[in-house]
Amino acid sequence: YKWNSHAVKKKFGDYSFSLGLVWTPSERHMVKANVGRSFRLPGANELAANGVHHGTFRHEQGDTNLKSEQGWQMDASYNLRYNGFSISVSPFVSWFSNYIFLRPTGEWSVLPHAGQIYRYTGAEALFAGTEATIDIHFLRSFNYRISGEYVYTYNCDEHIPLSFSPPFSMRNTLTWQRKQVMLYAEWQSIARQNRVDRNEDRTP
């Protein structure tokens, strides 16, 4: 019998902290800022997986040499509310000295219909992006919301994007509400993603 995984004994130690600031210059404006350091222990699957993940039906392999994930985060937000109109903008940036992620290897699995092998690995990585939302309340019972989000990822070790990077997306929502009755229509737009890892397909 061939074992797919072996016993792993690991010890991890690290620290995390966060600091935040809220400034309200008036009742219409609010500014927030946060900075922090985080760490995450690799999960059992990231350390010892070796087989088909039946949720995604791909062959995933762990790495017993993975160290804890370590990173620094900074984010801010600005909120404005004025006569039925509100806007919120939240930029952020994160830098990881050891970001743990799953990436395609280009090596084909010997397991039937499993495709290429995806392996957990660690790398220096950068994330940056923003989220924005605009709300407009009109005609007493209607509200229109448009929101968008964008995330930029970068593998600093290999100077390429990280795998599974989400594309830019927007969501439009029109809501009608009166007393306890509410109706809404929603439309979501998702852009192409051409910033992909090696051995990863672009999304149309």
Features from the language model and the residues they span:
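Surface-exposed extracellular loop regions of Gram-negative outer-membrane beta-barrel proteins
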Residues: 1-9, 12-23, 27-73, 86, 134-137, 141-150, ...
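Hydrophobic, lipid-facing positions within transmembrane beta-strands of outer-membrane proteins
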Residues: 15-19, 62, 72-76, 87, ...
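Residue-level detector of the transmembrane beta-barrel scaffold of outer-membrane proteins
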Residues: 18, 22, 30-32, 45-47, ...
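Structural signature of outer-membrane beta-barrel channels/translocons
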Residues: 22-28, 69, 79-83, 135-143, ...
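Gram-negative outer-membrane beta-barrel transporters
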Residues: 92-96, 109, 113-197
